[in-house]
């Protein structure tokens, strides 16, 4: 016997982001708000939702520096899985390499820092094309000294 839980996305994300959640016609989204503005939470819920609802795609999450991945976007993705009430046993969750793979379809969330060009240029998934890229803390990618 399977027990399913219904989760309302509208109860998980703020109204400002609800209209863009399932809009596949929007190709680029830049989320703006202040601190604690739920940008990372929205991105995690969107990525986790896409992971389980699209059997043919994967997700890449990037931060400027590797050393901040585990405590930020990786942790937020795990929190998103909990908020969507998806049992963690449905995923292979690894820290090295840092990935979250949905067992049912093989769709994966890949995590990478962008400390150097070599860190991101090889992220390819032959079986599940990357359909969503999340740049967490976008402003870090455009520091004045670079």
Language model region names:
Residues 1-146:
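Short, flexible loop motifs at catalytic/binding sites
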